[in-house]
């Protein structure tokens, strides 16, 4: 309830938040690319950009107003006609009034990226404790003590100089142990990955990432033989069930 209330109250700060989010995303993209370059991580990364497509003039004009805010945050996008859309992605049908193309965007297989990043981290001395249940985090003087249970032992206590909480929706629970308040809430998304097993399907599937605002879906090409489609945001708490109706 508190998250939803704060979420609704933030609508009055839409312009400011949009600009700040864009700036943060651009910086994040720079740092991620640096990590990829430094570590030599291969994860089917493609620098073909992303294409936002619109089927009605009303949507397209709204996108123009949004684009003005994105530009204030430093994001460069190009306004396109229908013919220009088909030039960038010839595999689309001719049924759009216009679009916006972000050339600087990229896509990749995030599972490959994170798993290979973990291996790089371990090679550099990082110790991962998998399947650990954190019971408490306490700051004692200049030290941080973390107590956790593991499948092989109980009430293990480790001491650290610093603690960085970066645990997705679990950050709320961990920050509370330190007297902090991180008011975030899980939103469940759905995606399917379509295999492209032959040359015909590989040639017909779009190469450029696509975002259809009306249909609320985004697509990405993962290498030459996979096509991912994601969409739907479901506010369902910590429920991990996959609803068949959502997939359909």
Stretch-by-stretch model annotation:
Residues 23, 27, 80, 108, ...:
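Conserved active-site and cofactor/substrate-binding residues in soluble primary-metabolism enzymes
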Residues 102, 146-150:
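Short beta-strand segments that buttress and anchor functional surface loops
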Residues 80-91, 106, 127-145:
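A conserved short coil-to-beta-strand element within the FAD-binding core of flavoproteins
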Residues 114-126:
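N-terminal Rossmann-like dinucleotide/flavin-binding domain of flavoprotein oxidoreductases
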Residues 1-7, 136-144, 157-248:
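Active-site substrate-recognition segment that forms the wall
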Residues 76-78, 127, 156, 181:
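Conserved beta-strand segments of alpha/beta enzyme cores
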Residues 2-116:
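Rossmann-like flavin
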């Amino acid at each position: 309830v508190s998250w939803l209330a704060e979420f609704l109250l933030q609508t009055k700060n839409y312009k400011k938040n949009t600009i700040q989010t864009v700036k943060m995303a651009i910086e994040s993209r720079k740092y991620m690319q640096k990590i990829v370059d430094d570590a030599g991580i291969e994860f089917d990364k493609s620098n073909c950009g992303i294409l936002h497509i619109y089927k009605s003039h009303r949507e397209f004009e709204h996108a123009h107003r949004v684009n003005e805010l994105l530009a204030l945050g430093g994001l460069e996008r190009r306004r396109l006609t229908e013919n220009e859309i088909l030039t960038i992605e010839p595999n689309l049908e001719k049924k759009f009034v216009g679009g916006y193309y972000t050339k600087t965007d990229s896509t990749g297989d995030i599972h490959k990226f994170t798993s290979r990043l973990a291996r790089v981290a371990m090679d550099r001395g990082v110790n991962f404790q998998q399947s650990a249940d954190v019971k408490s985090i306490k700051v004692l003087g200049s030290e941080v003590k973390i107590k956790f249970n593991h499948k092989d032992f109980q009430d293990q206590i480790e001491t650290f100089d610093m603690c960085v909480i970066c645990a997705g929706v679990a950050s709320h629970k961990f920050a509370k142990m330190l007297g902090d308040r991180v008011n975030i809430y899980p939103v469940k998304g759905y995606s399917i990955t379509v295999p492209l097993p032959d040359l015909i399907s590989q040639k017909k599937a779009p190469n450029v990432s696509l975002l259809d605002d009306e249909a609320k879906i985004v697509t990405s090409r993962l290498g030459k033989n996979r096509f991912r489609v994601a969409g739907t945001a479901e506010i369902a708490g910590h429920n991990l069930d996959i609803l068949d109706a959502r997939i359909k």
